[in-house]
């Protein structure tokens, strides 16, 4: 029988440099460890984020030389703690970057990687436009990760709007679905809680979604409200609109219970689409 897991989301502010991002996150990580957290979860672009017009321009470095990743690998090893580095900007090819997340084990090793599949190319309003693909190369593989505690599905931010990805992860065995994010304030106010609760309910999974909070250098801002949601869709922790640490306890027995009550993951049916046209239309 799995035992309850003490987790913490680090609700950090978007910082314009990697060094500032480390200085922002480390005190929160220390606070989480002092409180007994066994698994830490950081937001999207936790290694730094800024923007230029419609393009996101996070500071980046090659994976093997990335100061933020190295700092948290050392921290994981020193504290013997698992860490999800929600995502950082890793140098890619042709002048582009990769929005890549990691899970680090208790020895500080890279246990898994996930490259964000769905890139944030949207026009929220006439004046709020984002083109993540202008600088970022998309991934093409979902990430299901076996850890010492649970099977975890790692997604990132805009992925949240693509429920098929989450269903595929859940049907492949995920018990916890994670969506580190830097959700915008406007979309966050309208959709963040609803989308996270829906993904938890649809899949009978815990949702752990660490989200950055505050203004982004160059324009825009992130919503905050890091969430932990149980498999019944109930919010058990919400980080609100200030930086800090969000604590929760995750009991995987609740996954089996929710899926036993509503076993929809095993109820998929094949179907066809019948198109009915209005009379007179050819």
Predicted regions and their residues:
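Active-site catalytic loop in hydrolytic enzyme cores
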Residues: 64, 92-172, 185-187, 194, ...
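Active-site-proximal beta-strand elements of phosphoester/diester hydrolases
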Residues: 4-16, 21, 41, 100, ...
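Active-site beta-loop-alpha junctions enriched in small/polar residues
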Residues: 12-13, 88, 116-117, 157, ...
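Short beta-strand scaffold segments in enzyme catalytic cores
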Residues: 85-87, 100-103, 143-145, 226-228, ...
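CN hydrolase (nitrilase-like) catalytic-core segments centered on the catalytic cysteine
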Residues: 63-84, 151, 157-246
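C-terminal beta-strand edge segments of enzyme domains
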Residues: 113, 212-282
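Cys-nucleophile CN-hydrolase/nitrilase-fold catalytic domain and related Cys-dependent amidase chemistry
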Residues: 18-107, 113-115, 184-199
